[in-house]
Amino acid sequence: MIEADRLIQPQLQGQDDVIDRAMRPKLLDEYTGQDDTRAQLKVFIQAAKNREEALDHMLIYGPPGLGKTTLAMIVANEMGVNIKSTSGPVLEKAGDLAALLTNLEAGDVLFIDEIHRLSPVVEEILYPAMEDYQLDIMIGEGPAARSIKLDLPPFTLVGATTRAGALTSPLRARFGIPLRLEFYNVKDLSTIVTRSAQVMGLAIDSEGATEIAKRSRGTPRIANRLLRRVRDYAEVKHDGAVTKKVAEHALDLLDVDGEGFDYMDRKLLLAIIDKFMGGPVGLDNLAAAIGEERETIEDVLEPFLIQQGFIQRTPRGRIATTRAYLHFGMIKPE
């Protein structure tokens, strides 16, 4: 199974959550990247405020580490309301969700991370709450049990998921605002790195920020994590300032190459190239070849490699592209 402390993994690790929180933008105007999403949100939020209504329910989906939680916080700030946060696996019983819903005030945001992992029982309770702002509660047990309806104040449910396809159709259909987050480009990531460095009181030049951004796999969470490790290197081995050369040396030492790949990415690509002659290779065979679970390959390793054009996913299996061969100084056979 893939190591939990893999430096360039997009999932939270260590002190990420605490540190990310300190670096998060609070308003849309402070938020970098995702231009289409930001433009849409500005319109939806302003319209809801003009009508003095709760914002429509929102589903934010995309790979981990791109800012889904940050956007939920920004929505609450822009609307001037409170936000209550939880996650799908935490809501084990209907009563867990009912306790949250009954404590919401008008217009508040309820943020559910990993919403695709809601249990069916909890999801059933959510339907009338989302549609009619009503909560159906069973009182008593057995033949004496009866259902009562509680009115809820209008609220906004913001669901976040890395696997939108895993949501049930009835739940997905109840979100009026679906927003997909994409991997960030180097320019936007450089801006994020520079801003984070300012928050940390770290001297960094534009080339140093760009070098970190290039190796951050299009993901702000990874960029901030790499920035912290480069800072360590700069303070111990240099004068504390981050330049391109300092960033290069630090990230090379950490085994994060110019494309943002670590040994697991290279292991996956070389398995396709060397063991399966470039592919196509099925997911199960590939998982066995590198000793990983198929879900890890699909959810953690593949998305960035596909998005960057190093792997093609075809009906017959995975294929290493010409770009993958060039990365290792090889020529793809005809």
Swiss-Prot record:
Gene3D superfamilies: 1.10.8.60, P-loop containing nucleotide triphosphate hydrolases, Winged helix-like DNA-binding domain superfamily/Winged helix DNA-binding domain. SUPFAM superfamilies: P-loop containing nucleoside triphosphate hydrolases (SSF52540), Winged helix' DNA-binding domain (SSF46785). It is found in: Cytoplasm. Residues 258-334 are annotated as: Head domain (RuvB-H). GO terms for molecular function: ATP binding; ATP hydrolysis activity; four-way junction DNA binding; four-way junction helicase activity. InterPro entries: AAA+_ATPase, AAA_lid_4, DNA_helicase_Holl-junc_RuvB, P-loop_NTPase, RuvB-like_N, RuvB_C, WH-like_DNA-bd_sf, WH_DNA-bd_sf. One of its GO terms (cellular component) is Holliday junction resolvase complex. Keywords: ATP-binding, Cytoplasm, DNA damage, DNA recombination, DNA repair, DNA-binding, Hydrolase, Nucleotide-binding. It comes from the Bacteria. ATP binds at residues 24, 65, 68-70, 131-133, 174, 184, 221. Has 3 domains, the large (RuvB-L) and small ATPase (RuvB-S) domains and the C-terminal head (RuvB-H) domain. The head domain binds DNA, while the ATPase domains jointly bind ATP, ADP or are empty depending on the state of the subunit in the translocation cycle. During a single DNA translocation step the structure of each domain remains the same, but their relative positions change. Homohexamer. Forms an RuvA(8)-RuvB(12)-Holliday junction (HJ) complex. HJ DNA is sandwiched between 2 RuvA tetramers; dsDNA enters through RuvA and exits via RuvB. An RuvB hexamer assembles on each DNA strand where it exits the tetramer. Each RuvB hexamer is contacted by two RuvA subunits (via domain III) on 2 adjacent RuvB subunits; this complex drives branch migration. In the full resolvosome a probable DNA-RuvA(4)-RuvB(12)-RuvC(2) complex forms which resolves the HJ. This is Holliday junction branch migration complex subunit RuvB.
